[in-house]
Amino acid sequence: LHTLASHMHRLAMQGLSDTTKSSTPTDFALMNHVVHMILQVAPTAGVLAFVPPLLALAQETSAPVVSNAALVHHTLTCRWFVGAVFAQISNVWQQQSILDYLHVHHEPTLRDMAPTAPDLSDSYDPSPLEIPHFGSGLYSEAPAYAWDTPFLIEALSSNLALQKLAHVNAKSLQSWFQRQWTASTGEVDAATSARPIFVPTTTPQGLSRAPSMSPSDETSMDVR
């Protein structure tokens, strides 16, 4: 999953950091669907693999953009994607505080940016599929956008069910999420099967039994 997260981050940034080619709204719709499926079958590994690149993407697309309509809508779609995945994570892990945060600070400004994937024919169609690119649209600018990263990290790290299934404590999760992540970091994580390391605290924290509706135990914690 670390490798997939790195590829998704690079794809999301194509056209922003790399102007030779650009991702499309369809790419974001499909990435959102893929992450949704992963979080259903591997919620713990999915959080560990995808949260660091999400936080990196949030920071990289927080600056204002006014110069180019395509860049404006690409930037806004990146911000929508970050919020959409955090909403999925919060639903899976029943983290209501993050859902409330997104409802107040995220949805009112970015709900219109949700991309859609093209409908595919039930039968084989040899004609090329028209994939729309970023261009002019609803917005003329992408104003500066500040995510409350410390709050998001604190809320996820304090989730007792996540601590239990990841076999670490809140301090360990905070250290994992606070890392300076890059796509290259994700590839190294994949090569080394990296995961959070238990960090002792001065005040021991008992890992209480997870809520009855928490994600089921996963057969493997390998997040490569």
What would you call each of these model-derived segments?
Residues 1-224:
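Alpha-solenoid helical-repeat scaffold
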